């Protein structure tokens, strides 16, 4: 795993697939809400031309195939795009193994997709906009590639409880070490996307109408092992932003052992960690 000090480096680095394979166990809980909000099943546009933008391991694409499997293949097509060659390669293999003849996967930069203008009926971007270096460019690009009457539907994290577990582990270290609040962490790259009002305003500012925004929470349990794997690659980002050089030099290497100890002592070596994560969902249409 690449040691990334910001999210752009993390997504572009080696080993991101391993992290996503763990994270998809959680992100799957939120895919049906995303698709339902889009109104895809009631769409009058035909054929359906769908883009899964920042597709990751393809959890949204999985759900789309489950939902539309009864449709003749000529009635819909799917493009899976991600900036990561590692993730795109994984989805390409999935397409081959599952025989998704109407689907392709390709490397796509959300800010400059190089995809055709006015082509897609629906664009999905699940839990992605906070990771785009330029969200204004990404919004403009989605508007360009949508057909008239097409729909953008997104989700973004508002609250994820794994951060509190890491904070408790850092508190074990015998030093007065700063730690971000959830709000501060969620805002460290693209502030505002954890707010319904902000997301609504960004959709309208980009020219979308019939905008709907809602917040949905899910309760679940994740294994001690998986929570450790989720936190591990993000810790360098936290210490790079909130710790000074002296603190990093002295204590960064203590965090993972402290996290493992805290997890084992609190939940058991093979235990489950109760979690409640909250996401903001939004959808809007391009004018016809």
UniProtKB/Swiss-Prot annotation:
<feature type="binding site">
    <location>
        <position position="82"/>
    </location>
    <ligand>
        <name>S-adenosyl-L-methionine</name>
    </ligand>
</feature>
<protein>
    <recommendedName>
        <fullName>Glandicoline B O-methyltransferase roqN</fullName>
        <ecNumber>3.1.1.-</ecNumber>
    </recommendedName>
</protein>
<dbReference type="GO" id="GO:0032259">
    <property type="term" value="P:methylation"/>
</dbReference>
<keyword id="KW-0378">Hydrolase</keyword>
<comment type="function">
    <text>Glandicoline B O-methyltransferase; part of the gene cluster that mediates the biosynthesis of the mycotoxin meleagrin. The first stage is catalyzed by the dipeptide synthase roqA which condenses histidine and tryptophan to produce histidyltryptophanyldiketopiperazine (HTD). HTD is then converted to roquefortine C through two possible pathways. In the first pathway, prenyltransferase roqD transforms HTD to the intermediate roquefortine D, which is in turn converted to roquefortine C by the cytochrome P450 monooxygenase roqR.</text>
</comment>
<dbReference type="Pfam" id="PF13649">
    <property type="entry name" value="Methyltransf_25"/>
</dbReference>
<feature type="binding site">
    <location>
        <begin position="109"/>
        <end position="110"/>
    </location>
    <ligand>
        <name>S-adenosyl-L-methionine</name>
    </ligand>
</feature>
<dbReference type="GO" id="GO:0008168">
    <property type="term" value="F:methyltransferase activity"/>
</dbReference>
<keyword id="KW-0489">Methyltransferase</keyword>
<dbReference type="InterPro" id="IPR029063">
    <property type="entry name" value="SAM-dependent_MTases_sf"/>
</dbReference>
<comment type="similarity">
    <text>Belongs to the class I-like SAM-binding methyltransferase superfamily.</text>
</comment>
<keyword id="KW-0949">S-adenosyl-L-methionine</keyword>
<keyword id="KW-0808">Transferase</keyword>
<dbReference type="InterPro" id="IPR041698">
    <property type="entry name" value="Methyltransf_25"/>
</dbReference>
<comment type="pathway">
    <text>Alkaloid biosynthesis.</text>
</comment>
<dbReference type="GO" id="GO:0016787">
    <property type="term" value="F:hydrolase activity"/>
</dbReference>
<feature type="binding site">
    <location>
        <position position="57"/>
    </location>
    <ligand>
        <name>S-adenosyl-L-methionine</name>
    </ligand>
</feature>
């Amino acid at each position: 795993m690449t040691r990334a000090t910001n999210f752009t480096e993390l997504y572009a680095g080696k080993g991101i697939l391993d992290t996503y394979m763990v994270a998809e166990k959680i992100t799957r809980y939120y895919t049906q809400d995303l698709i339902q909000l889009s109104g895809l099943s009631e769409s009058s546009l035909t054929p359906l031309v769908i883009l899964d933008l920042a597709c990751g391991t393809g959890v949204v694409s999985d759900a789309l195939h489950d939902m539309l499997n009864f449709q003749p293949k000529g009635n819909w097509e799917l493009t899976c795009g991600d900036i990561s060659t590692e993730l795109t390669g994984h989805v390409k293999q999935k397409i081959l193994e599952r025989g998704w003849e109407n689907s392709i996967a390709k490397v796509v930069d959300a800010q400059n997709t190089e995809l055709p203008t006015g082509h897609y009926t629906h664009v999905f971007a699940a839990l992605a906009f906070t990771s785009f270096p330029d969200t204004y460019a990404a919004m403009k690009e989605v508007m360009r590639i949508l057909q008239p009457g097409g729909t953008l539907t997104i989700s973004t994290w508002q609250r994820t409880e794994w951060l509190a577990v890491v904070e408790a582990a850092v508190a074990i270290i015998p030093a007065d070490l700063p730690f971000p609040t959830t709000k501060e962490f969620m805002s460290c790259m693209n502030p505002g996307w954890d707010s319904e009002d902000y997301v609504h305003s960004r959709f309208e500012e980009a020219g979308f109408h019939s905008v709907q925004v809602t917040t949905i929470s899910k309760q679940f349990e994740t294994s001690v092992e998986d929570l450790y794997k989720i936190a591990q690659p993000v810790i360098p980002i936290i210490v790079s932003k909130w710790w000074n050089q002296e603190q990093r030099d002295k204590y960064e290497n203590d965090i993972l052992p402290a996290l493992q100890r805290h997890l084992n002592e609190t939940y058991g070596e093979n235990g489950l960690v109760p979690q409640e994560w909250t996401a903001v969902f939004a959808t809007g249409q391009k004018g016809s």
